[in-house]
Amino acid sequence: MSAEDILNEIKAAVINKAPGNAVITDVEFEGSEVVIYAKNPELFSNNLIKEFARDFRKRLAIRPDPSVLVEPDIAKDKILKIVPEDAEITNCIFDANTGEVIIESKKPGLVIGKEGSTLEDIKKAIQWAPKPVRTPPIPSDTIKAIRATMYRERADVKDILRRIGRRIHRDVRLRDDSWVRTSFLGGSREVGRTCLYHQTPESRILVDCGINIAVEDEKAFPHFDAPEFSIEEIDAVVVTHAHLDHCGFIPGLFRYGYDGPVYCTKPTRDLMTLLQKDYVDITEKEGKNVPYSSKDIKNCIKHTIPLDYGVTTDIAPAIKLTMHNAGHILGSAIAHCHVGDGLYNVAYTGDIKFEASRLLEPAVCQFPRLETLIIESTYGGYDDVLPERDETEKEFLRVIAETIARKGKAIIPVFGIGRAQELMLVLEEGYNQGIFNAPVYLDGMIWEATAIHTAYPEYLSKNMRNRIFHEGDNPFLSEVFKKVKNTNDRRNIMDSDEPGIILTTSGMLSGGPSVEYFKNLADDEKNSIVFVGYQSEGTLGRKIQKGFKEIPLMGKNGRSKAVKVNLSVHTLEGFSGHSDRKQLIKYLRKLKPIPDRILTVHGEVSKCIDLASTAYKLFKKETKAPMNLDSIRLR
């Protein structure tokens, strides 16, 4: 049966069972949902909606017909009249495709009203479905731009969703003897360019599609030359998190003809857009070939369908996706794919942290069903036991305090997302305790990434949420943090005799402001550089770690200049957003259910093999450390 035939059946059933005065105007597939448009959507009871969802075995959404929605300008005026001024409404964002209006305010409780009474008044007055949220304390240009794109291109976005819906909901029933296989196109026995390719007789799913920013040849990108891979056959792309080694090439897929959905959490959508734009800007400035443009990033945004943790969604014929917290960075997810009607279950961890941090809760380790687990191995080697976080924080603050005491500057190269915010929390506490007294400069994308963090407090740890909401203390707003707004600010910081701490991207000194700071501050022994994250082989960061005393770097005139390395060099591994060996093994021990097969990826050769070997000894299950271009039949 075609998707059109299925939709017609659903339409007939809805019209037959819906209240007569609901006035059904349309029923459509939009992405994974069946969307029912009605002039009086409030007449649909929760029981009737549940009955439809059970009968159709699909996610259901009831939305007001566009004709009954009050014009946004008039609707905003009505909202401001209904809601008490004390709520301090700062913005109203109207989404014509969903019929929702996001109401940002400093006191969302007043927008809700007693037992939701104010929300009901708003809905009756404007017909839009109100969604109150707390105003982010730091405005985000990225979120603003994404919302503007989605509003400006709303007609195109609706067409995209309907086209995707028809592809998802075509009638497909996998036989009991159907096969499931995964091809490893990148990130196997290496770190960088992560890309998995799940295949069934009816569907093709790409999970992550990253870039290895440490290399410049074809090894920077996944193996799109694999014989089984065809960009025209991809049904969906899933993104586990926003680091470039997992999401860096996704806009490139659109450049070369992909026209399907991208599934990720909302924070991942926003953060990956930020990183992709930054990657394009830096690559262009360095005169290198850029694999895609800002137009391709915009196209990616329009095709992105955000998912919440724990929500199961149809993403392709006979494949359902559920995303679970991975504990790595904001919005990071474990991608659990359910194939067929109980036929097979495979989960890919992405990058995981199985330990609570200041910022995030630990990774989820319990699933309804699981036959194959694909797990990262960044620190999977026998000797990869990282120091305890408390001890690492003390050592970090000691290095900072000593550097400031000798009137030096501490350069801390970091990924703009995740580790930067963790370190901000440590530095804020150290400053409050009087361990050091100097400004912390935030350069590169760190300020904007932090703004995005403040927009999604529900993804932060319970302790952070309590501190922000109940104690009224947002550490990201501390007076110690100073935004570096432009190159003049950067030059003034480098030329100043005053001590300071510089949090800057990129984390491996593969580009961005961190390289400029290093060039200008490396020869002064009063200064220090503190590595808090993994440094890939071949990067400037790895060379500094190895103790190079002189490093040739390109100057502004295009000529190579030898930079003397006199500053003190420190490496602190305990801040990693990855699980170390102990945490990885603990994760496998806690995993429920224990899968039949464990595959190790995302690590240097020895680390992937070591973790696979240990997993076999512990669980006596099939284990393997696949190589790039391997294909494994899972079922």
From Swiss-Prot:
Keywords, in A-Z order: Chromosome, DNA-binding, Endonuclease, Exonuclease, Hydrolase, Metal-binding, Nuclease, RNA-binding, Transcription, Transcription regulation, Transcription termination, Zinc
**UniProt-listed SUPFAM superfamilies:** Metallo-hydrolase/oxidoreductase (SSF56281)
Give the principal location in a single coarse category. cytoplasm
Question: Domain of life here?
Answer: Archaea
Q: Which GO terms describe its biological process?
A: DNA-templated transcription termination
- Binding locations of Zn(2+) 1: 241, 243, 328, 351
Q: Metallo-beta-lactamase N-terminus: where is this region?
A: 179-382, 179-383
Note down the stretches annotated as region Metallo-beta-lactamase C-terminus.
577-635, 578-635
Name its cellular compartments: Chromosome
Q: Which parts of the sequence are annotated with region: KHb? A: 70-137
Q: What happens when the gene is disrupted?
A: Essential, it cannot be disrupted. Strains expressing about 20% of protein at 22 degrees Celsius (depleted for FttA) grow more slowly and bulk mRNA has a longer half-life, with genome-wide transcriptional read-through occurring. Upregulates archaeal flagella regulator earA which results in increased motility. Inversely changes expression of highly- and poorly-transcribed genes. The depleted strain has greatly decreased genome-wide transcription termination.
Q: Which GO terms describe its molecular function?
A: DNA binding; exonuclease activity; metal ion binding; RNA binding; RNA endonuclease activity
Q: Which GO terms describe its cellular component?
A: chromosome
- Notes concerning its domains: The 2 KH domains (expressed as residues 1-149) bind 4U-tracts in the 3'-end of transcripts; binds preferentially to RNAs with more U4-tracts at their 3'-ends. Deletion of this region (exact residues are not given) does not complement the depletion strain even in the presence of wild-type protein, although the KH domain deletion also copurifies with RNAP. The extreme C-terminus is required for dimerization.
Q: Which family, according to UniProt?
A: Belongs to the metallo-beta-lactamase superfamily. RNA-metabolizing metallo-beta-lactamase-like family. FttA subfamily.
Tell me the function of this protein: Terminates transcription on the whole genome. Termination is linked to FttA-mediated RNA cleavage and does not require NTP hydrolysis. Cleaves endonucleolytically at the RNA exit channel of RNA polymerase (RNAP); the 5'-3' exonuclease activity of this protein degrades the nascent RNA released from RNAP.
Q: What is this protein called?
A: Transcription termination factor FttA
High-level lineage: Archaea, Methanobacteriati, Methanobacteriota, Methanomada group, Methanococci
Gene coding for it: fttA
